[in-house]
Structures are given as structure tokens and as C-alpha cells.
Amino acid sequence: SDLIAVNPDNTPFREGGRLLFRPAGHGALIENLNEIDADLVFVKTVDNVVPDRLKADTVASKETLGGLLLSLQEQAFEYLRETDGRVAENPDEIAAFVTEKLYRKLPASFRDMTAERKTRYLRDMLDRPIRVCGMVRNEGEPGGGPFWVSEPDGGESLQIVESSQIAPGQKELMARATHFKIGRAHV
């Protein structure tokens, strides 16, 4: 979603007489992650701010998300080292990691790929940022949640989808969602 850009005095910013719109929401945060030089980033929005008396739970959740993320990253790096310049000796094991731990459904064409092509495909799935996200039961609050998204290569990936990204004809999917996002960690 986009918002109107404003001046320091909170009046609408205009460029050439026209209102200027800027990316907003979680999408803008994710785009900015590319500019951050860090191994691990926690994203916390105003929705997730808690009073001091509840911060211990927040710290425990962050430690859990961060630990899971670093564990996934360590395994992904191991598979990347094993396949650097050579064909995967264990493509089924790597494919299982991609599908069961990174929640990426492989395209039907994967099973017919050559060993070299499978290795390249799996390396592409591993050699990218990894995100983990905490979820809570959906109790009717507005916002996004986890959904399977069809990818151009025929696979599917589990992504956080905001309500503004859901086609009007699919709004019922959001209403039936069982979980809601609470926070994210990225490497």
C-alpha cells in the first residue's frame, strides 16, 4: 500500500504540483532490508509494541524466532557448500529441507529435471534471504497471515499476505484464516 508523502509540518508533499505517494506498511520495511548491513534483523511494527510488563514474553519469542532462523541458515549454508561447483549427491535430502523447513513446494517439473538442473534449482532456493514469522491464532483482527502463493516456476511458497493483497473474490480466505502474523526475523 502507498501513503501520501508529507513535509516535516505534516502538510502533503507535492512534486511538480502533484501529490507524491510513497511505499508504506510491511512491504516498505521489507524493501528497506536490502539496505541494512546485518546478519539478523527483527522487524517489529506498532502492532507488536507491548508494555514493559509483557516484554519478557516478547524477548522469549524473539529468541525462539532468531534461533530457528539461524538453524535454518546454518543448514542452508551447509547444502550450498556441499553443492558449490558440483552436482548434489543428496538432492532428495536437500529438496526435503526446502519443502519441509523452508515451506517451498517444488514444481511438478522438478522430478524430471537432470541432476545438474536439480542442483541449480535447489541452490537458487537456498541462496536467498530466509524469513521466519511468528503467528498467533486469528481472532478476527485485521491484517495479514500465512498463505500459499503460486510462483511463476510452478512451485508454491508460504508467504505473509496482507489483506490489501487479496483479490476481492478471495476475501473469504482471509476471513477463514486460522492464524495471524505477530513478528518477523530475517537473515
Task: Identify the meaning behind each predicted range.
Residues P129, P142, F180-I182:
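A general secondary-structure signal for short beta-strands and their flanking turns/coil
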Residues A185-V187:
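Conserved small/polar residues in nucleotide/adenosyl-binding loops
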Residues E172-G183:
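Short nucleic-acid-contacting surface segments enriched for D/E, G, S/T with interspersed K/R
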Residues S1-E139, V149, D153-E156, Q165:
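Domain-scale recognition of functional cores that engage charged ligands
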Residues P146:
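Acidic, two-metal ion nucleic-acid-processing modules in DNA metabolism proteins
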